[in-house]
């Protein structure tokens, strides 16, 4: 009861305008990220609805990943120089228009040649990389951080995450569940004869992106940024360049970036491939795969983000909290991989399906714990107060780089282990992919542990107990 009262009091510290802004930012987040990244984690065997193969979905993801690598750091610069609200508005509108293009291709895919269709998908995913990174990612989190005080940063991100989960549950998960249960009860194979329901699904997402863009523009407050003119632009450019150099020289920030990379595989590759493994190797029912994917992606985020953010605030160190989440996640994924050795042929093993489903959900809970406070770890290293955006840019650049190079690797592995005449990889292929990702998670955990141990030693030497070095300035 005491914890609930404490949480209630913390929530009362947010104004109505701030809460509305965080809810809107949750919607902005979910709709921009949905089509390029999350739908494949909600709808098993997305490739069948698109009319391509499983390894080609990995190729599309790698394309957007490489574009992200090229635009992440410039995105931090833009967020420092231009209005984050206007950048986010532009991101929502442009992503919506591109999503309409995707919906049109889904609707007409049977009348197009497979190569021409895949080339268009490649262009779509590449453009999404620009609209969901260069003008979206850093502006989103800068605006979110401005809606909370220093003490309530994690809770503010938790509220945004909870809103994200609610929006995603209603507009992404429930619609996907209805489509798979009613229009495609036999799975994606049947979509070839009736692509309209899934195309309508994409049109709905595109429409919501347009609506959300205007709500961001009119209802999300933004702190003023430094004004630039012809006399100060050169000086400011030099200052920004110096800030980037300072950021790049911070070895702790590099290690935390690798730590974020290790955490991100839980949100991205594990979320996708473990679901695919349940569906295609353990032969889980289609409806179960959709329910698990939706629950993990959206329901859990709404249910646990605020509480995990509040729990993280109680820890003396955000990095320690993230280390615990990552360590437990590694154990659960290792257990999932070992389950694969219990699958025999094409027979449904309900024990494997049940245990794998539980492990999948548990890793989802831990993953959202990582997502909620992964940027708060910046507060535990010494950086300049004006380097926040560029620091987030470096964290995201390294952390999300796996969407490029790792999906290139998984595409090769998946294709090599795809049996002749099939569109999905084998159980051995899924196990190899999961093992590769597990190694990345272990490396990230090691990097985070090093920073935590060094910070602990430095605090003891200085006679301090507070791991938060930085006084947050979001202006």
Swiss-Prot record:
Q: Which Pfam families match?
A: MFS_1
Where are its TM segments located?
Answer: none
Q: Which SUPFAM superfamilies match?
A: MFS general substrate transporter (SSF103473)
Q: Give the source species.
A: Mycoplasma pneumoniae (strain ATCC 29342 / M129 / Subtype 1) (Mycoplasmoides pneumoniae)
Q: Which InterPro entries match?
A: MFS, MFS_trans_sf, Sugar_transport-like
Protein name per the record: Uncharacterized protein MG294 homolog
Q: Which domain of life is it from?
A: Bacteria
Per UniProt, what is one GO molecular function of this protein? Answer: transmembrane transporter activity
What PANTHER family does the database record attribute to this sequence? INTEGRAL MEMBRANE TRANSPORT PROTEIN, INTEGRAL MEMBRANE TRANSPORT PROTEIN-RELATED
Family to which this protein belongs: To E.coli YihN.
């Amino acid at each position: 009861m005491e914890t609930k009262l404490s949480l209630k009091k913390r929530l009362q510290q947010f104004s109505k305008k701030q809460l509305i802004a965080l809810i809107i930012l949750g919607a902005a987040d979910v709709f921009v990220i949905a089509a390029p990244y999350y739908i494949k984690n909600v709808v098993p065997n997305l490739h069948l609805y698109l009319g391509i193969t499983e390894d080609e979905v990995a190729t599309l993801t790698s394309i957007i990943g490489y574009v992200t690598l090229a635009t992440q750091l410039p995105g931090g610069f833009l967020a420092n120089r231009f209005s984050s609200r206007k950048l986010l508005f532009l991101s929502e509108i442009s992503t919506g228009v591109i999503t309409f293009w995707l919906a049109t291709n889904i609707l007409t895919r049977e009348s197009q040649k497979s190569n021409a269709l895949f080339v268009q998908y490649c262009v779509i995913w590449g453009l999404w990389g620009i609209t969901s990174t260069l003008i979206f990612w850093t502006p989103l989190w800068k605006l979110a951080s401005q809606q909370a005080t220093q003490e309530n940063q994690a809770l503010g991100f938790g509220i945004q995450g909870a809103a994200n989960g609610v929006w995603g549950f209603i507009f992404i998960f429930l619609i996907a569940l209805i489509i798979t249960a009613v229009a495609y009860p036999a799975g994606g194979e049947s979509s070839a004869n009736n692509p309209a329901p899934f195309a309508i699904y994409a049109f709905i997402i595109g429409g919501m992106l347009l609506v959300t863009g205007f709500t961001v523009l009119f209802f999300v407050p933004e702190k003023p940024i430094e004004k630039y003119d012809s006399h100060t632009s050169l000086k400011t450019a030099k200052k920004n360049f110096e800030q980037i150099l300072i950021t790049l020289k911070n070895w702790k920030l590099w290690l935390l970036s690798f730590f974020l990379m290790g955490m991100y595989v839980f949100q991205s590759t594990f979320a996708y491939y473990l679901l695919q493994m349940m569906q295609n190797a353990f032969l889980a029912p289609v409806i179960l795969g959709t329910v698990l994917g939706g629950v993990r992606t959206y329901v859990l985020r709404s249910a646990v983000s605020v509480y995990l953010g509040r729990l993280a605030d109680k820890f003396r160190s955000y990095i320690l909290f993230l280390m615990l989440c990552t360590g437990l996640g590694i154990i659960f994924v290792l257990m999932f991989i070992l389950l694969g050795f219990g699958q025999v042929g094409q027979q449904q093993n309900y024990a494997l399906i049940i245990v794998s489903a539980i492990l999948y959900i548990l890793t989802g809970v831990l993953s959202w714990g990582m997502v909620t406070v992964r940027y708060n770890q910046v507060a535990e290293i010494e950086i300049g107060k004006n380097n926040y955006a560029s620091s987030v840019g470096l964290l995201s650049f390294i952390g999300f780089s796996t969407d490029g190079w790792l999906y290139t690797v998984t595409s090769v592995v998946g294709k090599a282990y795809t049996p002749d005449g099939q569109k999905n990889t084998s159980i051995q292929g899924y196990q190899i992919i999961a093992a590769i990702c597990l190694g990345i998670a272990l490396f990230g955990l090691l990097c985070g542990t090093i920073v935590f141990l060094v910070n602990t030693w430095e605090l003891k030497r200085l006679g301090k107990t507070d791991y938060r070095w930085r006084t947050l300035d979001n202006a």
